[in-house]
Amino acid sequence: MAKQIKFSEEARRAMLRGVDKLADAVKVTLGPKGRNVVLEKKFGSPLITNDGVTIAKEIELEDPFENMGAKLVAEVASKTNDIAGDGTTTATVLAQAMIREGLKNVAAGANPMGIRRGIEKAVAVAVEELKAISKPIKGKESIAQVAAISAADEEVGQLIAEAMERVGNDGVITLEESKGFTTELDVVEGMQFDRGYVSPNMITDTEKMEAVLENPYILITDKKVSSIQELLPALEQVVQQGRPLLIIAEDVEGEALATLVVNKLRGTFNAVRVKAPGFGDRRKAMLEDIAILTGGEVISEELGRELKSTTIASLGRASKVVVTKETTTIVEGAGDSKRIKAAINQIRAQLKETTSEFDREKLQERLAKLAGGVAVIKVGAATETELKERKLRIEDALNSTRAAVEEGIGAGGGTALMNIHNKVAAIEAEGDEATGVKIVLRAIEEPVRQIAQNAGLEGSIIVERLKNEKPGIGFNAATGEWVDMIEAGIVDPTKVTRSALQNAASVAAMVLTTEACVADKPEENKGNNNMPDMGGMM
């Protein structure tokens, strides 16, 4: 296919038009008085959202050169979302400001490479300063503030704070759609995995359709068990203790399963069998986690352990196990706290090293199950459109809260960026590098300016006053008052602000140093001239 090429100023201007179109659509959502954007969907009702990255991903422009610029800024939002989970609109606003200011200077004859070095120098200082003024997050109230600011909803803030308090900072918090109108929290204590009972004959509570085992022993193996002879040594010892047994195995079938069911129906012995969770290496890791949590051992021939020589000392224990048709929950496992802590630290180390998103998700799940539990926020709303919008906001709030726990918080509403203004301005640089520093200085004013404009105020006046205010004092666009932002609960996670600034600078530097753009040439419509004559057809 033939290509079309644009060079230097013409190429950069075309990209800037695309940057502006995307950024202008995204930045109307910034701040407490930001508006929503309606996105057309090919199927179903339109999506109404104020989530920057969702809007950015939807935008596709007709002009291929403009589209390149738009896609580069969408990349800023996407990357910030991947790292921090929030702050995508801020990142877009920063990128637009840097690109716009940078191109003005390049058009006036500045060297793009010099500007790039200046931008990188300024951002490095800005990031260090943001970390220096960051405050660690303390207690449930601070967590609620971060979540409430991100979701623009006090109730959501309280819900997320309660979820994190219940399952701990390493716990898994997931979102589900509720059947009703209200948004509520459901917490699963202990370790839960997605495997239920095989036979309904194992149920102990017919009303709830679940098998509840009080103070059971837990046999953990990766084997397929078909002969009762293999299980007998362990079964006899458990029966003598008069306690129930949970068997977690690859499968229990034939004679072994029949014997367990018959004994349960006769009331002589209560044993519930569930399939081992996961597959392959992941199954081995999960069985090992269950063993550590319950103080048992994985009976595996790979490890030189055989079922027929299993003693009661190799079995795990828990205060309670609840088995439903689809899940098994182990509450208060009797594992050694030192072993559990060591396993948690090992998973954390693996999390730092992994580059796969899938592996990261699975490691996070394992960590949560060992560390405390799983919380489910069931999101409710009156209509499907509102439900989607609410779910996106809660997801952002959740990510924002995790980022705050990780790297602390700073003053919100763009105030943290304004508080580092003087430190960045003090950087010693000359020529085009100094121009790069000035571009970053102008860009870090932009979030405050945009928040004020979205609230119907003159942004420049707010920016000028902020430059002379004490650190931490900022403008509350929701009430129109000047307040201590952290005391007022208007906070932003440092990780979110830092990521937004770094990603915006990275893409801005790429656009400024672009000298040519290559795109596909649109095909001309050749019409139907070569169609054969259809004769007398109607």
Swiss-Prot record:
Its EC number is 5.6.1.7. It is found in: Cytoplasm. CDD domains: GroEL. PROSITE patterns: CHAPERONINS_CPN60 (PS00296). Belongs to the chaperonin (HSP60) family. Forms a cylinder of 14 subunits composed of two heptameric rings stacked back-to-back. Interacts with the co-chaperonin GroES. This is Chaperonin GroEL. It comes from Bacillus sp. (strain PS3). The gene is groEL.
